[in-house]
Amino acid sequence: FQKVGIVFQDPNDQLFAPSVKEDVAFGPLNLGLSKDEIAHRVDEALSLVGMTLHANKAVDALSFGQKKRVCIAGVLAMKPEILVLDEPTCGLDPAGVTSIMTLLKELNERHGITIIMATNTVDLVPVYMDRLAIMYRGNILRVGTAEEVFSNTDEIKHACLELPQIA
């Protein structure tokens, strides 16, 4: 169960503890880890997502983008091999989108975490993703690189998607 971590689309549906540190510590605490190991995991996860300076802040005092980062940190504190995210850029301004997508790419490239995300924002795909799957009504229509998948415009239209701007 620790191999896969899930991050919800809306961080307000995932966060529940009063402070950032308490929220990120929740998962490791429930694993029965030592206080030192929990503190180490919390510090490491907050550092990975750039939220170390906010560790003692109230969750309610954070911006939407900061809350998304805390959700990711909470999952990272569980040391997953796979991170599944539902619309991680939803509700973010362009700078926030770039920041979150860069973070996810770094988690994959530097830490070996497999990133799986659901998104309708096809413009992100060629820039940040090595492989993708196009789904429609629960069925996988095509799997491959962005170039392979987006070369079949009929399938893209069938899935009610548009081609990325850079395609």
Give each language-model segment a name:
Residues 83-86:
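Catalytic Walker B motif of ABC-type/P-loop ATPase nucleotide-binding domains
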Residues 119-120:
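H-loop/switch region of ABC-family ATPase nucleotide-binding domains
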Residues 125-127:
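A short, surface-exposed alpha-helical micro-motif characterized by mixed small hydrophobic
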Residues 36-54:
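Conserved ABC ATPase "signature" region
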Residues 79:
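Conserved catalytic motifs of ABC-family nucleotide-binding domains
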